[in-house]
A protein has these predicted regions:
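Active-site entrance/lid segments in N-terminal catalytic domains of soluble metabolic enzymes
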Residues: 2-189
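Hydrophobic alpha-helical segments that mediate membrane insertion or helix-helix packing
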Residues: 37, 202-203, 211-214
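Extended hydrophobic/Leu-rich segments
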Residues: 71-75, 208, 215
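Active-site-proximal beta-strands of protease catalytic cores
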Residues: 157, 207-212
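Single conserved hydrophobic/aromatic residue that forms the stacking wall/gate
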Residues: 215-224
Length: 224
């Protein structure tokens, strides 16, 4: 049975065991956690800016992507019947991010499969993701920003509704999903107070394809 609302959902979003993207959390989301999430069958993610750097040392983001990519590749070779889900990198697209263009080049180099963009929709970022076969999911808090993101080349949307962490929006998930689904038939994720199987199922019934949450993965040894 096809539980997804989109008619053209990318394979990268359907390859996991559950329709879940583990949200990229400031400081908390690190390679150990991302790898564990992917091996468990959900898309793990981290903000690029979590890979903090020290002067004179190798570029930390490159080290993180190398480790995640190689470890997931090794897992998939050893477990062909139980492959890991893909991973995602969150890029803060706001022009106050001095690392953005360099970090984009590194993500292209490592063929990051899923890009989560926040705080600004820029066509050149979407084009970079597409150049390496990636897809772009853009954080939005209302229908106006949703339209702008798609117009500028994003592949899908993450509806950040009331109750979500980070840059949360004020709208009810019921209203936000309904507004977007009136015109958008592509990949649509929902974020906001989703922490149980019942909430996941309700999100899918409302019209979301996937949900974004992380709280249930935090009390794990890999995130300590």
């Amino acid at each position: 049975m096809n539980i997804h609302s989109s008619t053209n959902l990318p394979a990268v979003l359907t390859s996991g065991k559950l329709p879940v993207v583990a949200a990229p959390l400031f400081i908390i989301s690190v390679p150990d956690l991302v790898i564990a999430q992917c091996k468990a069958g959900v898309i793990g993610s981290f903000p690029a800016l979590n890979a903090r750097e020290k002067e004179g040392e190798p570029i930390e983001l490159e080290r993180w992507l190398k480790r995640i990519t190689e470890e997931l590749d090794r897992h998939n070779q050893e477990n062909p019947d139980n492959p890991a889900a893909p991973f995602a990198v969150n890029q803060i697209v706001h022009r106050s991010n001095p690392r953005l263009m360099r970090d984009i080049e590194i993500c292209v180099k490592w063929n990051v499969p899923v890009w989560i963009t926040s705080l600004g929709a820029r066509p050149e970022v979407n084009e970079a993701a597409h150049s390496c076969g990636g897809i772009v999911l853009h954080d939005i808090i209302n229908n106006t920003f949703a339209r702008k993101a798609i117009e500028k080349g994003a592949d899908g949307l993450i509806a950040v509704a009331a109750g979500a962490g980070g840059h949360a929006g004020p709208q009810s998930p019921f209203a936000l999903i309904q507004e977007i689904r009136e015109w958008f038939k592509g990949p649509l994720l929902l974020s906001g107070s989703i922490a149980t199987g019942r909430a996941l199922l309700a999100s899918l019934m409302m019209g979301a394809d996937t949900v974004s949450y992380t709280h249930l993965t935090l009390p794990t040894i890999c995130s300590v």
